[in-house]
Each structure stands twice: as C-alpha cells, then as structure tokens.
Amino acid sequence: MGESPDFISDLPQSIIENILTRLSIRDAIRTSVLSSKWRYKWSTLTDLVFDEKCVSPSNDRCVVETNLVRFITGVLLLHQGPIHKFQLSTSFKQCRPDIDQWLLFLSRNGIKELVLKLGEGEFRVPACLFNCLKLTCLELCHCEFDPPQYFKGFSYLKSLNLHQILVAPEVIESLISGCPLLEFLSLSYFDSLVLSISAPNLMYLYLDGEFKDIFLENTPKLVAISVSMYMHEDVTDFEQSSDYNLVKFLGGVPLLEKLVGYIYFTKYLSIGDDPGRLPLTYIHLKTIELYQVCFEDADEVLVLLRLVTHSPNLKELKVSASPVQPFPLEEEGFDLFERDYFDYKLPSLESVKITDASGIRYELEFIRFLLGTSPVLETVTVSSSLSDKDAKMDMVIELLRYPRVSPRAQLLFLQD
C-alpha cells in the first residue's frame, strides 16, 4: 500500500499562517512537531503575545520567571522577519533588565504595536523605545519614562494608552502633540494633573484620574469622550476660574457623538461663570451618560439642561444621582425650571434611565422636563436609593402625575 497523503504538510502557506495566528505563541511553537515543513513556520509570525501562561506553572515564582525570560529570549533569537506586534503581560519584576534587551531588538525590527502590562512598581522605559518610529499603537502600564531630547514624537502613532505612568505633565503634552495621526487616547490613574490636549485627528478620549484641569485645545474630530474625574473633598481650588468649564472643555468638539462622565465630572463642568446659551450645538451627540450628579447643586443640574437642550439628535440619556449631600439647596435656585426650558423640544430622545433617585425637587423637575419635551420618548426607567417604602411610593405617585408629550412614553420603576 502506498503512503497516505500528508495533508498537513501540503497545506497552502496562507492557511498555515491563518492557523498559526489563531494559536497562542506556546501552541504555535508546538506545531514544529507536526512535520519537517512546519518546524520553523512559527518563526515568521509577526504578532508575538507573551504572558505567564507561556511556560509551565510552578509554585516557585522564581522558576516560572526564569523560564519565561528564557522562552521570550529564545523566541526572539529564532524569529525571522519583521515583528509588528509585541505584547508582554507579567507581574514579575526580575525580568525587567531583559525587557531592555528585548526592546532594543524590537526597535530594529519595525515594531508597530507595543504593549507592556507590567506589575506594581514602575519600569523605567529605555531610550531605545523612542527609536521605534514606526509605532502605530503604544500601551504602557506601570512604567516610568522620560524621552530623550532628540525625540520629536511618533509620526505614525494612532493609539496611545498610558495606565499608572510616572511622567512629567509637560512630557505627556509633548508626546500627544508629537503624534499628529493620534486617534485614540487613554490616560488613567494620573494624579494632580493639569492637562492640555492638542491632537487634530483624535476621535476617542478616555481619562481617569485626579485632574486639576483639562484643556481640549485642538480636538475637532472627537466623537467619544469618557472622563472619570476625582477631586479632593475641598473643591475650593477648582472654584477660582471665571471661565465656564462646560464651554472650555466641550466648546471645540462639534462632532461629538457620545459623552460619558463619572464621579466629579459634572461638578467640574459646572464650575465658572455660566454665559447663558452654549456657543455650540451638538448635532451629532446621540448618547449622554453622567454618573453621580448632585441634584442638590443647581449648577450641576444646569449642566444637564445645557447639554440636553443643545443636543437636538440626542437619543439616549443615562443619569445617576449622587448619594452624597454636600450642601443644602439654595432657595433662589428653585426657579431653574421656571425659565424658558419648557419651550425647548428634545425631538429625538427615546430612552432615559435615572438611577439612585431620592425624590428631591430637582430630580423630579428634571424628569418632568424630559417627559414634557420629548415627543418620541419611549421609556423612562427610574430606580430609587430610598429605603423608606412610603417615601418611595410618594415619589412614584408624583412622577405618574406628570404629563407626557409622547403617546408611547412609559415610566418604569425598578427596585435598587
């Protein structure tokens, strides 16, 4: 009998490459035993992803770390051709001197995507990283870096993600402005940072940290913004500016489609002298999510009103009330909804979700406003933070009394 055909060895190169790219690097290397033709097929992979699962588990972390270093070094030594992506996720610290050598190797191999997710403690990024001028994506976690003076930026970088990075504020700003093609920017766990962002092609912005101030100086193409902003309990330092933060932060983003804000973000937007109407109508804005809004603060409620009334195509609104009570409501603030807001129409609003409602005046008035100005509204979902059943029932009865301009509008009450 003749030998059966060796289908594995005779697979087209494109199919072999497709198979290898779907495997972990460890399993890809194991394909070397399939046949002599497969022995070094893995060595031309352009995307290399490493983590602690690349080596056999052991109760001795030192053994695992040593094996991981040897594994990565061996892969790089045997690799042939360009490396487009290199990703390392590890909590080990002793391998950090080896990372310097790996980055030097990568800087000479046309690396385009670099991801370093390291454990606690800052890893000082070597200068050779800034020689990786073909980078299109850079993600660093628990690192420290200070670019050399000759560094002018990454001309091709489109995505920048920095998580818990030790770096001077001016370095961040210089890095961002030195990436003219940047489309995605994420900065998280930054403390006491005054940040100016100039990125003419930026489309997606995610910020998480204790920012003192944020300036969007040149971001005309932004379509999505998400900000988690933390402040000290004493916010007097943030009350000094006469510029209205809502205008300062959102005054130059005409293409905005989605806005999400957490913690003190609405408070931050409310600071400064309100100019009246906003200078910009957000015709593309379809989703607004603002969490932990203090409905006892008339200025924060005004931010909500300003945003929804200047977003004619808004479809979805999510708001959570702040569980804290920072100060009593001033009586003169009660005329907020007696202005001309009920002359507005929200022609596209379909879905509203209010969470952690406690039934205070401004919460109820805001819901009444939405019901009375949204002709295509379908659902208003309300969940309450009240523990007293009678108080909760009073709130429900009050809300059911409000007129609705949409014949399809439904009020749904959920138990927290």
Curated annotation (Swiss-Prot):
Residue ranges annotated for the FBD domain, each copy included: 346-384
Ranges that cross the membrane: none
UniProt-listed InterPro entries: F-box-like_dom_sf (IPR036047), F-box_AtFBL13-like (IPR053781), F-box_dom (IPR001810), FBD (IPR006566), LRR_dom_sf (IPR032675), LRR_FXL15/At3g58940/PEG3-like (IPR055411)
UniProt keyword annotation of Repeat present: yes
LRR repeat residue intervals: 115-142, 164-189, 203-229, 238-263, 294-321
Keyword Repeat in record: yes
Protein's name according to its UniProt entry: F-box/FBD/LRR-repeat protein At1g13570
Entry keyword set: Leucine-rich repeat, Repeat
F-box domain boundaries: 5-53
Protein source organism: Arabidopsis thaliana (Mouse-ear cress)
PROSITE patterns: FBOX
Pfam families per UniProt: F-box (PF00646), FBD (PF08387), LRR_At5g56370 (PF24758)
